Amino acid sequence: MLLLENKKIENNKMKKIYNNLSIENLTKTEWFNWFNEYEQQEIIKGLEKNLDVSWYAKQEYSWTQMKQLRIGLEDNLDVSFYANPELTCFQMLEIYIGLRKKLNVSIYTDPRFNSLKMKEIRMGLQKNLDVSVYAKPYFSNYEMKEIRLGLRDHLDVALYAKKDFNCLQMEQIRLGLKKNLNVLLYANPDFNPDQMKELRYGIKRGLDASIYAKKDFNCRQMEEIRLGLKNNLDVSLYANSEISWQEMREIKLKLQKESTQL
């Protein structure tokens, strides 16, 4: 509230500079010459439409920021939500879009949210999702997207909406939940996305993925064990993390050949 009050006081002071001046005379003032050509154009455009340019006729704003504020004023929006020089013009645009759609933009006006993060929060608000689950600065925009998609599909996002997971790990957990799989077997930050994928494939096929749900196996080793299980082979003969995936493949192929000869 104090910040907004200070802005109003500053705006009132600035109004005195041009309230009684024509646009032509205003352009001849020392104050006007503080701004570069592009900034001056934004001020003139605002004045020509009788806008309260005191919101943006300030040196701390670039002309692109001024433009976003001017457009907001033209649309009769409450630009106080984004009249902040700490926000980039792209962040301002996301807040502007939210205001146009009558969303509660206060949830994402924090400058710590870059424009891409703001977009994910805005998209969630547009679908009436509980964006508080992911409207947190420590999530990347990609992580926010995975949580948003999970909320959209009514999934238990609490299983992966955590700082411990990156966006690719979140994706694997989300895809498993979407297919009603028991993701608890691999919803573990110790597994990388490729390992999670192999476990998801195994669970999806109804295989005993617990046999290779060990972080010591890399994804290629997991794949060979999974393919062995798929073909009803005795994978215990090569399910050893000390055996390379190439050796595992050789053993697997040998077991497959023997099984066809029976």
What is the predicted role of each segment?
Residues 2-262:
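General marker for long, soluble alpha-helical cores
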